Amino acid sequence: MYVERIPIEVPTRAPTGRTACYVLGREEALLVDPPAPDERIEAELDRVGSVAVTHHHPDHVGAVAEYAEAADATVWCRRGRAEAFTPATNATPDRVFSEGTEIPTGGEPVVVRDTPGHAPEHVAFETPGALVSGDLAVAEGSVVVGDPEGDMRAYLASLRRVVGLAPERLLPAHGPEIDDVRATCERLVAHRLDRERRVLEAVEAGNRTVTDVLDAAYEKDLTGVEDLAGATVRAHLEKLAAEGHVRWDGARADPA
């Protein structure tokens, strides 16, 4: 399938400072994650038939309404998430998708794959040989999975699921394409499990608040990203509590 990748500078916490949107197919194409108006997207609108997003974060949805109207395109939304989709995008969905839905293009359809974790509605779009993966994975560094929307257990399950799908490459929203899918997903799983271990050790050592756990579990300088790191610690504590390893009431953590 023909894939056009268009990286666009937008206000984002991602290190690249850009979000890539994708045009999938040559005719009646699917436009994925248009983050902001851009003349390169506008040049493709005459062949766009549908618009969808991997999830609702602002750096992925900024031009959904504008380009759906300009292309007279079908707007797709995750089933059960329309109430969140409309205020995020200023667009009303025409159709809904769920796991396995085939979104038609002029050629082969694009298949929806559930990949929650980074956000509850997060999906990926499967084309022959590639998976448009949104914020599921990055070639370098890690992905923020932060409370309240982030679900660490779901995120790890999504990474493992993608390994099982075995796409030839991942097409992420931030950073370069990912050719070694298995190695990247396994690296991200290992990173999260190592952070989880550090969080658990911090709680067992007597740290009770998110701030205290943060100081104990992170060795690097968190200047400018303390809020993201704190949200990540809370997501780890939610997972550890669900699995019976700690007691966590949203403010205080104790060993189980």
Residue spans for each PLM region:
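Conserved beta-strand hairpin/beta-sheet module of binuclear metal-dependent hydrolase folds
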Residues: 1-44, 123-139
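Active-site HxH/HxHxD metal-binding segment of metal-dependent hydrolases
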Residues: 10-17, 34-107
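Divalent metal-coordination and catalytic microenvironments
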Residues: 24, 33, 55, 97, ...
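Hydrophobic residues in well-ordered beta-strands that form the structural core
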Residues: 32, 75-77, 133-134, 172
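Residue-level signal for the nucleotide or nucleotide-sugar donor/cofactor binding architecture
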Residues: 62, 150, 228
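Metallo-beta-lactamase
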Residues: 109, 114-196
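Hydrophobic residues on short alpha-helical segments
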Residues: 185, 189, 193-204, 234-238
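C-terminal regulatory/interaction regions
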Residues: 204-256
